[in-house]
Amino acid sequence: MKNLSPNRIQVSLSKPELVLNPYTGASGVYSAVVPDVSGLNQLEFLCKKLGVGFHPDETHCTVVYSKEAALTDPATAEPVAGKAFWYCLTHIEHWKGHDGKTYIVAGVCSPAVVMEHARLRRLGAKHSFTPFKAHITLSSDVEVTPEVQAKIDELNLELALAPGSASFINQKIVDVKKG
């Protein structure tokens, strides 16, 4: 895969294995945004082409996941009200997660998400996985067979010619509590 620019991020559709609570600063900080209707439609199309299930209620882009470090002042944890975070779908790839499972993810470019991640870091969050790769997982615990790789390669050709674009909306900032 090509070197990623600082403004390129990965997006994950996996079900978070977290319990999300209102933000108090007691147990780390988690922030995420969700795709708008146009984005959900594009992601559903990608999942169909890959032959994997689509779970719109679990679809999100992680802005920051800080298991240990909370924001220095919980009062600063206000989401950017009404802000839409534009993004561009750029590619599909797979990687091994920290749990050893293989994930298929859709790559996006979103300077606004990168800037919000940096803002929350300046306020005290420490992203638990480096480098920062906010992501929407299209499928988890997948065996990447030659057939699956061929589907990924075909989608990457399509995205190279016509990348999708949409916006993330509805930012949430909450405590992280191991579930």
Residue ranges and their predicted role:
Residues K2-G179:
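Histidine-dependent nucleotide/RNA phosphoesterase domain, centered on the 2H-phosphoesterase fold
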